[in-house]
Amino acid sequence: MRGHKPTLKEYVLDLYPEPTDLYCYEQLSDSSDEDEGLDRPDGQAQPATADYYIVTCCHTCNTTVRLCVNSTASDLRTIQQLLMGTVNIVCPTCAQQ
């Protein structure tokens, strides 16, 4: 295009930039809430934990025993190694005998 007027009607020459609101409407929490996850003396956060369900058999009567634990993945591996080794779980009925 080399003239003062466009030759094609599709060109829109009267567009202006639209202002964008750069204000962040996020509510900031109190700074004391951020320190709740920092329970270690060195200021590191607690490792992530999750709920795990363990289903095993009673050592005495072989009934199904279900455990629910909240642990880190590495600590759950330790529990698994203990259960595969010498630690045995008994049901509440056998525990009272």
Curated annotation (Swiss-Prot):
* One GO MF term: DNA binding
| Keywords recorded for this protein, A-Z | Activator, DNA-binding, Early protein, G1/S host cell cycle checkpoint dysregulation by virus, Host cytoplasm, Host nucleus, Host-virus interaction, Inhibition of host innate immune response by virus, Inhibition of host interferon signaling pathway by virus, Interferon antiviral system evasion, Metal-binding, Modulation of host cell cycle by virus, Oncogene, Transcription, Transcription regulation, Viral immunoevasion, Zinc, Zinc-finger
**Chief localization class?**
host cell
Q: Where in the cell is it found?
A: Host cytoplasm; Host nucleus
Q: Provide a GO CC annotation, any one.
A: host cell cytoplasm
> Is Aminoacyl-tRNA synthetase among the key words of this record?
no
Position of sequence motif Nuclear export signal:
76-84
What processes does the entry annotate via GO biological process terms?
DNA-templated transcription; symbiont-mediated perturbation of host cell cycle G1/S transition checkpoint; symbiont-mediated suppression of host innate immune response; symbiont-mediated suppression of host type I interferon-mediated signaling pathway
Zinc finger residue ranges, unnamed: 58-94
The keyword Oxidoreductase is annotated on this UniProt entry? no
Q: Which domain of life is it from?
A: Viruses
Give positions of region: E7 terminal domain. 1-40
Q: InterPro entries of this UniProt entry?
A: Papilloma_E7 (IPR000148)
* Residue span of motif LXCXE motif: 22-26
Q: How is it modified after translation?
A: Highly phosphorylated.
Q: Which family does it belong to?
A: Belongs to the papillomaviridae E7 protein family.
Q: What domain notes does the record hold?
A: The E7 terminal domain is an intrinsically disordered domain, whose flexibility and conformational transitions confer target adaptability to the oncoprotein. It allows adaptation to a variety of protein targets and exposes the PEST degradation sequence that regulates its turnover in the cell.
Quaternary structure per UniProt? Homodimer. Homooligomer. Interacts with host RB1; this interaction induces dissociation of RB1-E2F1 complex thereby disrupting RB1 activity. Interacts with host EP300; this interaction represses EP300 transcriptional activity. Interacts with protein E2; this interaction inhibits E7 oncogenic activity. Interacts with host TMEM173/STING; this interaction impairs the ability of TMEM173/STING to sense cytosolic DNA and promote the production of type I interferon (IFN-alpha and IFN-beta).
Q: What does this protein do?
A: Plays a role in viral genome replication by driving entry of quiescent cells into the cell cycle. Stimulation of progression from G1 to S phase allows the virus to efficiently use the cellular DNA replicating machinery to achieve viral genome replication. E7 protein has both transforming and trans-activating activities. Induces the disassembly of the E2F1 transcription factor from RB1, with subsequent transcriptional activation of E2F1-regulated S-phase genes. Interferes with host histone deacetylation mediated by HDAC1 and HDAC2, leading to transcription activation.
Mind telling me what this protein is named?
A: Protein E7
Q: Source species, please?
A: Human papillomavirus 33
